[in-house]
Amino acid sequence: RGSNGVVMVTTKRGQEGRATVSYNGYYGWQTVSKKIDMLNAYEYADLVNDARNNTYTDKMESINRKLIAQNKNPLSFDISDSNAIRLQNTSNDYNTIVPVEILPYLRGEKGLVDTDWQDEIFRTAGMQSHSVSVSGGSPKIRYYASVDYLSQEGVIINSDFTRYSSRFNLDVTEGIFKFGLSLNPSVTIENAVNSDGAYNKDGGGIIASALHSAPIFPVYNADGSFCFAQNAWSPNTQTTLEDGSVKKGNSQTQVWNPVALALLQKDETKASRIFGNVYGEVAFMPELKYRANFGIDIYNSSQDTFRPSTIPVANTEGNPESEPEATAKTAKMYNWLFEQTMTYNKDIKGHSISALAGWTMQYQRDESTYAFANGFITNNVPTLNAGTVTRGDSHASEWALLSGLARVQYNYKGKYMVTGALRADGASRFGKDNRWGWFPSVSAGESFMKSLTFIDDLKLRASYGLTGNFRIPNYGAQGEVAYYSYVLGGNSADVVKGAAPKSMPNPELHWEKTAQVNLGFDASLFKNRLTLGLDLYNSNTYDLLLDVPVPMMTGYQTRLENIGKVNNKGVEFNIATNQKMGDFNWSVYFNISKNINEVKELGPGNADIISSGS
């Protein structure tokens, strides 16, 4: 636990005094900082014309080389040849003809379609945030409450994010008792678009589609419907040749109209989350306190997508309507943490002793469902019950952690400091005989040279600690069973569903551990105008949790194992200065570090571990 550091989060709490009401808000705009420079319609037509002429020239030169090799006369050709002659010379190679749709642009006609597809999908997106809070209290009761609203449009059309949240904190003190609670509920609504996908699959990525769309095609047809002329086999962009024959298709890259992709598809995610925390504290005596803390984190989300029939089938003659598709996904997470600690603090003639002992329990359960439906008879009802659900899935998993901890700190007049700590963690993810890990740590520091006038503080420190990592799948040690469909017998329709092992168990799996030594010093000079810090560290991680390839005869590809050693060592140095000149303050901070990472051991013979996926 804590092998990658610990983040401490402190929320706003009420202060003693009269009630204070405050408001904070802003309104702003966001835009794409830089668009990609693209050709306009006339430049695009010139480029396509050059490309087709080059293709025609290369094709004819290849044909003539073969004719000469056969002692035959070469064919005469020129880039001014008509499409009919090009087809005759190349035996109907349609890649050599000049698309009819670009001819008006080559002639320089005015007032033709010239679409900037980036301008069509991007926008100046507004965003606003508002927060109202009230806080106050008495010596016995302090409170803080706030209500927040955030609305943010996406820079791509038809995308936005909205969040409603609130926070309530209460602290009550009565004699030797202290009580408090925190509550932070929030609701978010997100309308997303496929901004990162490829232009010709996966629903059509909006940005990629815009960058692949030719500027000679409009966003809308004359009747106001979306133009899908660049969906390669569209009949309204048939190429008519000089002899009257027709080549179906527009000779351009197949791509859906990106504006239609953004506006017609639905991808809405609604989520709610509640962070809650309640604590109680009893001071049995000034030096001895007991504290219990219980926190919860509850998360629920639902995602609904719908792709209407008005987005045509890709690369198909006539732009026929596609079959509508919809998905529904849900996710639930429930996490609770219960902590109990006893602390003792005592000062005796410059000797300060602080001790802590505690016990914690944590549990989390995750659930998810997925359903896919098609066969919708209308685009007006995008819910799954209006179609036919053809596949679905659901998952549930849980994990738990028990921990015991103890810490003792000694301080003598702020000059000598020693800390020792020990924690034991038991994780459900490991085998029943290997769930517990023990993690001790010790540190010491000394402040000296305060007698020198230019030195405000100089502290040397050293520490050693052992931390653990249990971030593996919840059932990584046990192995999982999955359901599969299998064809039995000679009749392919005889599909039988059964269960089979999915992952290879490893009951010997245990904690990955990291032992780290730190040496360093901190200095403050010239009345705290200059501060320095230096850290040297050496970290050894062993029993790494890795997926290791296993022989194929086992029926598995990999097994989770404790294997290998990794060393990290390095240095960090920082220097800062804080200067005040009257009412003017300025500061400078500089930091530099170097880390050396070395894989010391990786299984028998240090063989490489090669795996796919994430």
Predicted segments, located by residue:
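Residues embedded in well-ordered regular secondary structure
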Residues: 15-157, 195-197, 218-267, 280-283
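Extracellular/periplasmic, surface-exposed regions of secreted and cell-surface proteins
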Residues: 163, 169-177, 182-187, 243-307, ...
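Active-site beta-strand termini and strand-to-loop segments that position acidic
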Residues: 11-12, 523
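Flexible loop and strand-edge segments within Gram-negative outer membrane beta-barrel domains
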Residues: 32, 107-148, 152-159, 167-248, ...
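N-terminal plug
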Residues: 1, 12, 30-35, 508
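Non-catalytic regulatory/gating segments with a bias toward low-complexity or hydrophobic composition
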Residues: 7-9, 573
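A residue-level signal for beta-strand positions that form part of recognition/binding surfaces
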Residues: 6, 20-22, 142, 354, ...
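Flexible, glycine/serine/threonine-rich loop segments and coil->beta-strand junctions
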Residues: 1-7, 14-20
